């Protein structure tokens, strides 16, 4: 189990990303459309003025059952240990043990 403070920090980041998503997208669109270097610099400064945690790449992909940050399968949102346990118990529909 991950530290509760790390899980809480990630939840906080998700909320901040959601809050600033529209503003960040509009600034990025304007930045990509701008041709003048000075105009691009001005827009870049506005992007840098946004909170650091409002960038979506700062969100860590975590297991929803344990909060572990590593070995997480995107399709299930589970870490490899939980995926294995739940697959053996039959709690994941459509997941079967492979044999060939």
UniProtKB/Swiss-Prot annotation:
This is Small ribosomal subunit protein uS14. PROSITE patterns: RIBOSOMAL_S14. GO terms for molecular function: rRNA binding; structural constituent of ribosome. It comes from the Bacteria. Belongs to the universal ribosomal protein uS14 family. The gene is rpsN. Keywords: Ribonucleoprotein, Ribosomal protein, RNA-binding, rRNA-binding. It comes from Prochlorococcus marinus (strain MIT 9313). Part of the 30S ribosomal subunit. Contacts proteins S3 and S10. The lineage of its organism: Bacteria, Bacillati, Cyanobacteriota, Cyanophyceae, Synechococcales. One of its GO terms (biological process) is translation.
């Amino acid at each position: 189990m991950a530290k509760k403070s790390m899980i809480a920090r990630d939840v906080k980041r998700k909320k901040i990303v959601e809050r600033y998503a529209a503003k960040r997208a509009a600034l990025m669109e304007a930045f990509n459309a701008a041709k003048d270097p000075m105009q691009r610099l001005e827009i870049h400064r506005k992007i840098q003025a946004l909170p650091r945690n409002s960038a979506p790449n700062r969100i860590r992909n975590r297991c929803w059952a344990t909060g572990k940050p590593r070995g997480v399968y995107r399709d299930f949102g589970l870490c490899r240990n939980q995926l294995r346990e739940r697959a053996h118990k039959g709690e994941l529909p459509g997941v079967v043990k492979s044999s060939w």
